[in-house]
Regions:
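Short glycine-/aliphatic-rich beta-strand segments at the starts of folded cytosolic domains
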Residues: 15-27
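Subtilisin-like serine protease catalytic core
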Residues: 97-111, 115-128, 135-185, 199-202, ...
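Autoinhibitory propeptides
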Residues: 1-12, 31-98, 256, 364
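C-terminal subdomain of the subtilisin-like protease fold in secreted/lumenal serine endopeptidases
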Residues: 163, 202-205, 335-416
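Catalytic-core segments of hydrolase enzymes
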Residues: 201-297, 350-354
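Active-site glycine-centered loops adjacent to acidic/histidine catalytic or metal-binding residues
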Residues: 112, 240, 318
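Hydrolase catalytic cores
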Residues: 148-151, 172, 176-178, 248, ...
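Catalytic-core environment of secreted peptidases
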Residues: 120-122, 127, 138, 266, ...
Length: 416
C-alpha cells in the first residue's frame, strides 16, 4: 500500500515548496516518534488509539518522511464540518420509556461544537467537557447543543414537550468545531480519544464529516473503527447532506464498523439531502435511517441556528439531527444490557429496523425503531431443550438380525 494517497499527492503538487501542509501520520507498531520521524520537530496532536501524530510539514518533508522505515501511512488532515441542512414518537422511544428505561447511567459523548451548559434540559447530566478549538466548550454555534438535546434532552424547559431519545443518559462533550461549524480531522480524532481513553464513554455521536466519497481508509475513519475494536465504543456517524446522488457518503460515515445514519422525514420518505451509498469501495451505506427533517431540540443561548419554534428550542434539518436518534437508541439498549458489545448493538439495532421499501444505499436496512431495537437487545435466547433420553435397545437373540432402519441410522451418525 502506498504511504501517500493520491489526494495528498495532488495537494503536494499544488503547493509551494515552503508551504506547510497539515497531515496525519501513522507510525508502524514498535517505532517511537523519534525513530520514525526524526526530522519532525513540532507536533500538533499525538494519538493513542493508533500510533500517530498530526503535524504540519512541507511537501518535501512529506516525501522524505514517506521513505522512513517506521512510517506506515501519511494522510491529509482534511477539514470537517457539521451536517446541518415530532421525531421521538416516530421511532417508538416512549414505548421504551414506559418500561422505565431512559438511558440512565449510559455515558454518551457528543463530539461537536460544544454545548450550552446553562440550558435547563441538561441540568445535572453534563459530566465533563473539553474544548480542542478554544478556551471554553460553551457552544457558540448551536449545532452541538441541538444534537445533544436529541440524544438526551430532558425537555424541562418545554414542560416535557421536546424530549430527547434517552433523557437520563450522561453527557460528555468534546468541542472540536469552531463557531462557523468547521474543524479538522485531527481535532475530531483528539476529541474521540478524550472521550474513549479519559472518559470511558460507551457511545460517541459524530454529526459531522468531510465532503466526497471515501473508502474507509482515511485517518478519521480508521480512528473510528479503532474506537469500536479497541474500546468497544458504539460510534454513530452522520452519512452527510450531499444527496440524493449516489456515492456521496463522506468520512467518517464510510468507516466499516460505525453505525452510519441517513435522514428521513416523519412520513418515512428519505430526505433528498441525505447522502447515498455505496462507498468508494462498493459497500452499502448508510446502515440505517432516522428522522432528520424539521427536528425540534434545544437552542444554545446567543446562537441563530435553525428556526425558532419556542423559547429555547429550534427546528433544524440534516443527517446531523438523524444521528443522535441512533445514539439515543443505543443508550436505551445498553441500559438494560450493558454487556452488549459495540458490534452487537449495531447488529441488533439494524435487526429491529423497518424496511421502507427503497434501495439499500438510500436507507440501509430501513427506519430505526427504538422499541424493536430494545427488544432485540434484551431478548432472552430460547434455551435448547435437553435431548430426550433414549431407552437402551434390548439385546436381540443370537439368531436375530438388526432391522434395516437401525442400520441406516448407524450409517448416518458415522458420517459426523
Amino acid at each position: 500500500m502506498a504511504k501517500i494517497p493520491a489526494g495528498l499527492h495532488s495537494q503536494m503538487n499544488s503547493m509551494s515548496n515552503d508551504e506547510p501542509i497539515p497531515v496525519i501520520i501513522r507510525r508502524k507498531q514498535g517505532f517511537f516518534r523519534s525513530q520514525a520521524m526524526p526530522m519532525v520537530a513540532e507536533v500538533e496532536q499525538s494519538f493513542q488509539l493508533f500510533p500517530g501524530e498530526a503535524v504540519k510539514i512541507t511537501a518535501a518533508e512529506i516525501d522524505e518522511l514517506s521513505r522512513q522505515e517506521g512510517i506506515e501511512e501519511i494522510w491529509p488532515d482534511l477539514p470537517v464540518r457539521t451536517w446541518l441542512d415530532t421525531s421521538v414518537p416516530v421511532i417508538a422511544a416512549p414505548k421504551v420509556w414506559a418500561l422505565g428505561v431512559k438511558g440512565a447511567g449510559i455515558k454518551v459523548a457528543v463530539v461537536d461544537t460544544g454545548i450550552d451548559s446553562t440550558h435547563p434540559d441538561f441540568a445535572g447530566r453534563i459530566m465533563a467537557t473539553k474544548s480542542f478549538v478554544s478556551d471554553s466548550a460553551q457552544d457558540d454555534n448551536g449545532h452541538g447543543t441541538h444534537v445533544a438535546s436529541i440524544v438526551a434532552g430532558s425537555g424541562a424547559k418545554s414542560n416535557g414537550k421536546y424530549v430527547g431519545v434517552a433523557p437520563e443518559a450522561s453527557l460528555y462533550v468534546a468541542k472540536v468545531l469552531r463557531a462557523d461549524g468547521s474543524g479538522s480531522m485531527s481535532g475530531v480524532m483528539a476529541g474521540i480519544e478524550w472521550a474513549v481513553l479519559e472518559q470511558n464513554v460507551k457511545i460517541i455521536n459524530l454529526s459531522l464529516g468531510g465532503v466526497g466519497s471515501c473508502d474507509g481508509t482515511d485517518a478519521l475513519s480508521v480512528m473510528c473503527d479503532e474506537a469500536v475494536t479497541q474500546a468497544g465504543v458504539v460510534v454513530c456517524v452522520a452519512a452527510g447532506n450531499t444527496g440524493p446522488e449516489e456515492r456521496t457518503v463522506g468520512s467518517p460515515g464510510c468507516a466499516r464498523l460505525v453505525i452510519t445514519v441517513g435522514a428521513m422525514d416523519d412520513s418515512g420518505r428519505i430526505a433528498s439531502f441525505s447522502s447515498r451509498g455505496p462507498t468508494a469501495d462498493g459497500r452499502v451505506k448508510p446502515d440505517i435511517v432516522f428522522p432528520g427533517v424539521n427536528i425540534v431540540a434545544a437552542q444554545a443561548a446567543g446562537t441563530h441556528m435553525g428556526q425558532v419554534v419556542a423559547a429555547g428550542y429550534v427546528a433544524a434539518n440534516g443527517t446531523s439531527m438523524a444521528t443522535p436518534h441512533a445514539s439515543g437508541v443505543a443508550a436505551l439498549m445498553l441500559q438494560d444490557n450493558p454487556e452488549l458489545t459495540a458490534d452487537q448493538v449495531k447488529t441488533k439495532m439494524l435487526a429491529g429496523a423497518v424496511d421502507l421499501g427503497v434501495p439499500a444505499n438510500d436507507q440501509g436496512v430501513g427506519r430505526g425503531d427504538a422499541f424493536k431495537a430494545y427488544e432485540q437487545a434484551t431478548a432472552t435466547p430460547t434455551p435448547t431443550p435437553p435431548p430426550t433420553p433414549t431407552p437402551p435397545t434390548p439385546t436381540p437373540p443370537p439368531d436375530s438380525k438388526p432391522s434395516e432402519p437401525q442400520g441406516c441410522l448407524a450409517a448416518l451418525f458415522s458420517r459426523r
